[in-house]
Each structure stands twice: as C-alpha cells, then as structure tokens.
Amino acid sequence: MPTAKQLADIGYKTFSTSMMLLTVYGGYLCSVRAYHYFQRRSSRRQAAEEQKTSGAL
C-alpha cells in the first residue's frame, strides 16, 4: 500500500505530465492556425494580383 507521500508524488507527476501535454498540444494548434492564416493570406494576395492583371487587359 503506497504511503500518502507516494500518492501525492504520483498525483503531482500525473498532473504535471498532463499539463505539459496540453501545453505542447496548444502550441501545435496555435502553429497550425498561424500556418493556415498565412497560407490564406498569401493565396488572397496572389488572387488579387491576378485579378488586377486580368482586369488591365
């Protein structure tokens, strides 16, 4: 039977690990959003440039 200190240590390590994984996952989600944002921005810019050049003809 684990002592109270051992249970507290296990709980702390479990909590710390879950917080670390949530932080890593949050960073991943944030970077994916930023990547898609910049992809859409560049494709919109390209479409605007194409529209300008086709409108000038």
Curated annotation (Swiss-Prot):
Mitochondrial intermembrane compartment residues: 1-14
Cytoplasmic-side segments: 38-57
InterPro entries referenced in this protein's UniProt entry, alphabetically: COX14
Subcellular location: Mitochondrion outer membrane
One GO cellular component term noted in the UniProt record for this chain: mitochondrion
Record keywords, A-Z: Membrane, Mitochondrion, Mitochondrion outer membrane, Transmembrane, Transmembrane helix
Membrane topology value: Single-pass membrane protein
A biological-process GO annotation: mitochondrial cytochrome c oxidase assembly
Transmembrane annotation, as ranges: 15-37
The UniProt record lists the keyword NADP: no
Entries under Pfam families matching the protein: COX14 (PF14880)
Major location (coarse): mitochondrion
Binding partners and assembly: Along with COA3, core component of the MITRAC (mitochondrial translation regulation assembly intermediate of cytochrome c oxidase complex) complex.
UniProt xrefs under PANTHER family: CYTOCHROME C OXIDASE ASSEMBLY PROTEIN COX14
Role according to the record: Core component of the MITRAC (mitochondrial translation regulation assembly intermediate of cytochrome c oxidase complex) complex, that regulates cytochrome c oxidase assembly. Requires for coordination of the early steps of cytochrome c oxidase assembly with the synthesis of MT-CO1.
Protein name (Swiss-Prot/TrEMBL): Cytochrome c oxidase assembly protein COX14
